[in-house]
């Protein structure tokens, strides 16, 4: 179970990670970090290539043009959005912003506050289906991907108009609150018993 929104395995040391890999993959994985990274890359890419559907969230959605933005350091989100023929995006109403110019602020804020970076390794903007070129009966054919966007309410719209809760809409889930929280640094994220851990 993740303990941190941006760094979900921060509570594990390399030996615990190796045990997790070994248990999941049913093979002996050494606690060598570069080896584990290569193993994760190999296994995940095999799964991505076989997938009929990729499901992602989004760091923001732009009302002006309907685009969504994904901000990552690993590149997995880009693979999930491009290889499978169907892409499903699940995004909460609180992540919708008016204009593309507003996205620039979030793109500066997230890496700085989340991981102390100037910019992330991968920034992906998606504003509709992209063509997929593949071989069919000896010929290269072009087909459009299918992209579905699910807007998640779950009380979000009501919270936006509540004087006590509307401040929650300012959260971009960078986790900087966790990084400076003395309680979180003492007890960790698991004691909160929910997806979002204190802070």
Locate the predicted segments by residue.
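Hydrophobic alpha-helix feature that most strongly marks membrane-spanning transmembrane helices
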Residues: 105-111, 115, 173-182, 186
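Ferredoxin-type iron-sulfur electron-transfer modules in oxidoreductases and energy-metabolism complexes
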Residues: 136-168, 178-179, 184-199
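Conserved structured core elements
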Residues: 38, 97, 165-171, 175
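Iron-sulfur-associated redox domains of electron-transfer enzymes in respiratory
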Residues: 1-160
